């Protein structure tokens, strides 16, 4: 069933974010809001566009005490961007409408409006401007400490635990998401050769430069899913670039374009291997995995996997992050791709991922 918000016309460019449109959007959840002026104070364009809006309210037009700045996220930079990322925009809008209200005790950005339009393909979320809370945004070139990793695993255990083996929205994409859909393109001789031929790909083991070998490993990982344990709600893209940290160090997750019903080990392995330095990961990964399992097992109604099964699942899931090497520069800067490639290639060998997958 559509929400009343979905009946709104959703602008396809930034010029459409007028005072009247923002007033109408905010009034769905915050009646009697009246915006007098909107100015765009910075734009980040990628798979989705994120525009920082500075609002001026009419006298008496802010009875709910809304902030003077917020972010509008959607496809505002042409049909190609909308075609590329539109499915993700829909999922994020639906996440903030249906699932975020069930996660109020977890740190995620606030959302003031979320809507999707099946005709235009546009979806828009008006969300909190996190800079007003003096957060620090995660970046792969700045790995976290083992203590921060432990707190983040507590966050993930809380997310996973409350949806453990419980049906969640049918609108979620099936695990493993887009990576499986684009495998043929990623592993084509032309594309794979170009990506693994870059200097940043120097850590890639010789065997994995063969796209067919990589395909076999990915397919073995996906096939192993049935042995990983109960499904749950996962973030689906739990890397440092999708995280932020409050001044007291508490973590939060951004970018909910890829929530999935899938295996807990996807989030845990992707986060741990990608967020710790190689040295820290080698030193603390077993201890941190045990910590996650203890936190998961403390959730109501959850029987956490035993350590041996969890360790195997953790080793197998390294293949997800290994695919960072196939990320082109128009999607992520080279320094971010290089940092993740180094960490996942080291883990691939340290953890004998191919052997864990029966290859």
Regions found by a protein language model. Give the residues of each.
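Regulatory N- and C-terminal appendages and interdomain linkers associated
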Residues: 1-46, 58-67, 139, 170, ...
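Short acidic (Asp/Glu) and glycine-rich catalytic loops that position anionic groups and cofactors
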Residues: 2-3, 247-252, 266-273
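Conserved ATP-binding subdomain of kinase catalytic cores across diverse folds
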Residues: 38-185, 264
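Secondary-structure capping and boundary motifs in well-ordered enzyme cores
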Residues: 42, 119, 148, 230-237, ...
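Active-site acidic catalytic loop and adjacent metal/ATP-binding pocket
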Residues: 46-62, 71, 218-264
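Active-site activation/catalytic loop segments of kinase-like enzymes and analogous catalytic loops
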Residues: 84, 94, 98, 258-261, ...
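ATP-dependent phospho-/nucleotidyl transfer catalytic cores
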Residues: 135-235, 247, 343, 347-359
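Short helix/strand-bridging catalytic loops that position acidic/His residues to coordinate divalent metals
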Residues: 136-145, 253-257, 272-276
